[in-house]
C-alpha cells in the first residue's frame, strides 16, 4: 500500500494516495493489535479485502497515469501471484488437483524448516507466537520486490527483469528449503 501511495503522490494523484494510505493505516492498526499474539483472525475475507483494494488501486494508478508502468503493480504483487502459480504448477506436476490443500507453501516450509529449528519449543510454547515468527522472513522476501518497484516504477524493462529475478529467487529459495540447504544467515 505504501508503495502505491508513494507512486500516486509522485504522479500527483492525491485521492488515490489517500485511499491506499487508509488501507495502510487499517493494516498497521491490525498489525499493532495482532502481532505477534494473533488476537484477531482476518482470514480469507480480510485477505480478499486487502487484495481487492490493492488491485483496484493498482489498476486505477496505471489507467490514470500512463507514465506508470503496468509492471509496477505486478512487481509489488508478485509474491502472492507467483506463490499461487507455483503452487498450481507444483501440484499439477505431481498429478494432484490444484485445488487440493497441502502443507508445501513457502511460508509453511519456512516455519517447518527454519523457524522451528531456530526457536525451539521450550522458548516459544504458544503456537500463535511460533507461527508469527515466520512473518519477518516473508516481510524481507516481499521487500525484495517492493523496493525495486518503488525505485523503477516508470522503467518497464527493469521491472520485468526484477520480476524474473524474483521468480528465480523464489524457486531457488524454495528448492533450498525443501532440500534442507538453508544458508546459516537465514537461521539467525
Q: What are these model-derived regions, one by one?
A:
Residues 1-188:
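Alpha-helical transmembrane segments
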Amino acid at each position: 500500500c505504501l508503495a502505491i501511495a508513494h507512486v500516486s503522490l509522485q504522479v500527483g494523484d492525491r485521492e488515490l494516495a489517500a485511499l491506499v494510505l487508509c488501507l495502510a493505516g487499517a493494516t498497521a492498526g491490525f498489525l499493532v493489535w495482532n502481532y505477534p499474539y494473533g488476537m484477531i483472525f482476518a482470514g480469507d475475507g480480510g485477505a480478499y479485502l486487502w487484495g481487492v483494494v490493492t488491485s483496484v488501486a493498482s489498476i486505477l494508478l496505471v489507467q490514470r497515469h500512463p507514465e506508470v508502468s503496468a509492471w509496477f503493480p505486478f512487481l509489488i504483487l508478485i509474491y502472492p501471484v507467483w506463490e499461487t502459480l507455483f503452487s498450481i504448477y507444483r501440484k499439477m506436476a505431481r498429478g494432484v488437483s490444484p485445488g487440493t490443500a497441502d502443507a508445501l507453501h513457502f511460508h509453511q516450509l519456512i516455519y517447518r524448516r527454519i523457524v522451528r529449528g531456530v526457536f525451539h519449543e521450550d522458548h516459544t510454547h504458544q503456537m500463535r507466537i511460533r507461527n508469527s515468527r515466520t512473518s519477518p522472513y516473508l516481510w524481507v522476501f516481499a521487500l525484495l520486490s517492493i523496493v525495486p518497484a518503488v525505485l523503477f516504477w516508470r522503467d518497464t524493462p527493469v521491472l520485468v527483469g526484477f520480476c524474473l529475478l524474483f521468480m528465480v529467487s523464489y524457486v531457488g529459495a524454495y528448492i533450498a528449503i525443501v532440500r534442507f540447504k538453508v544458508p546459516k544467515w537465514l537461521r539467525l
